[in-house]
Regions:
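Acidic, surface-exposed loops and disordered segments
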Residues: 2-123
Length: 123
């Protein structure tokens, strides 16, 4: 989603309305599928947010086939309809050993233009 796309969908910035007007979706339209490319774009945008010491410790697995979602079923105790009807399940993991790759993570951030070299040099 680009900035213009986000602004088009943005309707309200009132914290109380957002907090108390939220919904928890329990059933999805089984006929609507989010493309793999769109899921990747959403993950890339979400991970643009800063993390502690900019280590980006998150890792993702996208289960989007019926077979892969079926493998998850024994692990889901509640709200199984969400797994059954969703376009995909996105599993989010935290890398507890990310500090071991700190230098590589910082170098990659500089290469991708996500971190200035002078900030990287201070790490």
């Amino acid at each position: 989603m680009k900035e213009e796309k986000m602004n088009k969908n943005f309707k309200n910035n009132d914290f109380s309305d957002i907090t108390f007007g939220r919904k928890s979706v329990r059933l999805y339209d089984e006929n609507y599928k989010i493309s793999h490319e769109e899921m990747l774009e959403m993950i890339q945008e979400a991970t643009a947010a800063p993390s502690s010491v900019n280590m980006q410790p998150w890792r993702f697995i996208i289960a989007e086939t019926e077979e892969s979602k079926a493998k998850l079923k024994p692990l889901i105790r509640f709200n199984t309809r969400q797994n059954d009807t969703s376009s995909a399940m996105i599993l989010i993991f935290g890398d507890m050993l990310n500090y071991e790759l700190g230098e590589e993570i910082y170098d990659q951030a500089v290469a991708e233009g996500k971190m200035p070299q002078e900030v990287r040099d201070q790490q």
